[in-house]
Amino acid sequence: MAKYVPDIKTQRWVIIAATRTKRPSDEQKTKDNEQKAESNNQKIAIPAGKQESGHACPFCSGNESMTPPEVYRIGSGGPNETGWDVRVVPNLYPITDIHEVIIHSPSDTDDIEEMSLDQVTKIFTTYRDRYRANQDSGQVMIFCNHGLGAGASLKHPHSQLVVVPNQINLDAVEMEPMNNIIEEHVNFISYCPDFSQWPFEVWIAPKVKGKRFGEVTDEELPDLAGVVQDALKKINTALSDPMNAAFNREEHFIYNYYIYHGKNWFLRIIPRSIHRAGFELGTGLSVNIMDPTMAAEWLKRGKLA
């Protein structure tokens, strides 16, 4: 069971989840294999269904027996068999008592910005359905850590769903005004809020306010999938521009995104292009080296005017 420790003065909380130290790490496995290969003067071959580490990937099709029994799937085939398009399983190393892994596709390498719109729509359909299934149990947080530098322990593209008890106060940013608009779709708007804490941070929000994420309709899901995919493509292009060499590109496009858990929901994309240092950690203040107005213009036009 998760252990919650409060700070009485600020009503902020810490979750003690010691089992998380047991998570498998592709980064460490890859380093170990590279060292072995170098010592033997060999190249690493990557068989199907395995990561760069050379170890079997539990999220690849054909390796369903390596995960706990699934709780949801989109696609053909029976439970815990091949044929799925999106698959959801309990997390073996949970943060809280309800913690699920949403596997984006059978592919080990396809990222959201590279998938078909139909596949991305299936991912967001899964988000919506799992939100609905868990909303009576607490505050539902859906998030994606893309890349090892963004907190992912396994490279196979996936998201996570965590349920936090209602009595725990979440220190989460709420909806920001829709300034610096990038693009307007049928049901959603993408923008860079004035309160952007990260360079090229993008928010996506529904035009209709006052709703929770679980209220997104089947008709709205393809539009949402499209605006998120488009935003990720634009951010990646901007960060790849030589004029933005100041941003960290040690690893191919790393980012986090999450869906706000309560009313007036939004999706927030945070490119991890800079590192937080002592000043930010010590003061709680964020330093953004890219003006949100300029970021929105860049993302809208593909360059500064």
Regions found by a protein language model. Name each.
Residues 1-156, 162-212, 216-219, 232-235, ...:
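Active-site microenvironments that recognize anionic phosphate/pyrophosphate groups
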